[in-house]
Amino acid sequence: MDLFEYQARDVFEKHGVPVLGGIVATTVDEARAAAETLTSGAGSVVVVKAQVKTGGRGKAGGVKLARSPEEAAEAAEQILGMDIKGHTVHRVMIAEGASIAEEYYFSVLLDRANRSYLAMASVEGGVEIEQLAVERPEALARVAVDPLVGIDAAKAAEIVAAAGFADDVAGAVADVIQKLWTVYDAEDATLVEVNPLVRTTDGRVIALDGKVTLDDNAEFRHPEHAELEDAASADPLEAKAKAHDLNYVKLDGEVGIIGNGAGLVMSTLDVVAYAGERHGGVKPANFLDIGGGASAAVMAAGLDVILGDPQVKSVFVNVFGGITACDEVARGIVQALEILGDKENKPLVVRLDGNAVEEGRAILAEANHPLVTLAETMDGGADAAAAAAHSAVTA
């Protein structure tokens, strides 16, 4: 479960990680009141930050400085309802401003390849860390973390030294790193990331932004996470998917993906990403696994979720029939399109194979829906869906 920034901030504060004051607002009036609470006089600055589970908020206009409660209200009015990479902004966080001297980066995450944990740190924070890792990999220190030991004082000192932190800030950063490890360990997280971790002009080291992903498999140990999950599912698409017990993850691309089985869906994401490189750089818009034995109703529900995403420009349905029969999938597609009627105009590329494939193809052929195209292979279907999305984006 990915947390919103304001939720990550609250979890940080719970475990002693230094953070600035922040208040969540869902209306303009609430934003104004929050700014009044956080500003202490002339010259006080707050930051109005869109709460969405995607990057690029600043570039999209989702982060604005405000020097008065009225400016905060105006910023909130502009940000609330904004679409950022397909994510609608339903709430903002009004955060205290800070006078920043330096920006750093730190994260700890599950390292599946090595069956361990990995800490990453850099003295160059506040940038796209993926870009930094590619262009200047030496600027990003990577330190393995023993799951049985964690990040104690010695390991924190090793991380700080590997990243090249200056002596005058190394101790404070190491202390914050240990507290961030406590968040990771105590909350059963798979990712804790701070970008930027900052040193202010008065010498404090503060987590200015935060990203936390909690392990859903550890929910039984954390009944308190239920409240976080309810708020984290406030996105209408995620809430709709959850209501139908669909395994859905929103991504930032333009090609909607539906498949049966996590392995097939992951493979489909890869194939669509490769196809997108040939068609203007379009990418997968989501992960959606309808599971084994899915009925026509489940297929229709999944299609309804994906077609409701304004970021999606085309859909690729890739099903290998086993327990899930291809004729049930075909009926679900026809059913969903009948319900949506003229409201929907996004092209669907469908690749069926396996159990009842001929029956499924016959159902779609008989329906003869103008939006549906049948593909013989996964590669061919991915290419057609990527091409359709690119055409829609450039139209």
Curated annotation (Swiss-Prot):
Which residues make up the binding site for Mg(2+)? N195, D209
Residue pairs linked by disulfide bridges in the UniProt entry? none
Name the EC number(s).
6.2.1.5
| PROSITE patterns the UniProt entry points to | ATP_GRASP, SUCCINYL_COA_LIG_3
Subunit structure of this chain's protein: Heterotetramer of two alpha and two beta subunits.
Task: List, alphabetically, the Gene3D superfamilies matched.
Answer: ATP-grasp fold, A domain, ATP-grasp fold, B domain, Succinyl-CoA synthetase domains
Catalysed reactions, as listed in the record: succinate + ATP + CoA = succinyl-CoA + ADP + phosphate; GTP + succinate + CoA = succinyl-CoA + GDP + phosphate
Pfam family for this entry, one: ATP-grasp_2
Q: What does this protein's UniProt record list under function? A: Succinyl-CoA synthetase functions in the citric acid cycle (TCA), coupling the hydrolysis of succinyl-CoA to the synthesis of either ATP or GTP and thus represents the only step of substrate-level phosphorylation in the TCA. The beta subunit provides nucleotide specificity of the enzyme and binds the substrate succinate, while the binding sites for coenzyme A and phosphate are found in the alpha subunit.
* Listed GO biological process terms: succinyl-CoA metabolic process; tricarboxylic acid cycle
Q: Which UniProt keywords apply?
A: ATP-binding, Ligase, Magnesium, Metal-binding, Nucleotide-binding, Tricarboxylic acid cycle
Give the binding site residues for substrate.
N260, G322, I323, T324
According to UniProt, the name of this protein is Succinate--CoA ligase [ADP-forming] subunit beta
Note how many cofactor molecules are bound and how: Binds 1 Mg(2+) ion per subunit.
Record bears the keyword Nucleotide-binding: yes
Q: Name one GO cellular component term.
A: succinate-CoA ligase complex
Pathway assignment reads:
Carbohydrate metabolism; tricarboxylic acid cycle; succinate from succinyl-CoA (ligase route): step 1/1
Top-level taxonomic group: Bacteria
* Cofactors demanded by this protein: Mg(2+)
Q: Which terms in the Gene Ontology molecular function aspect does this entry carry?
A: ATP binding; magnesium ion binding; succinate-CoA ligase (ADP-forming) activity; succinate-CoA ligase (GDP-forming) activity
The record's gene field reads sucC
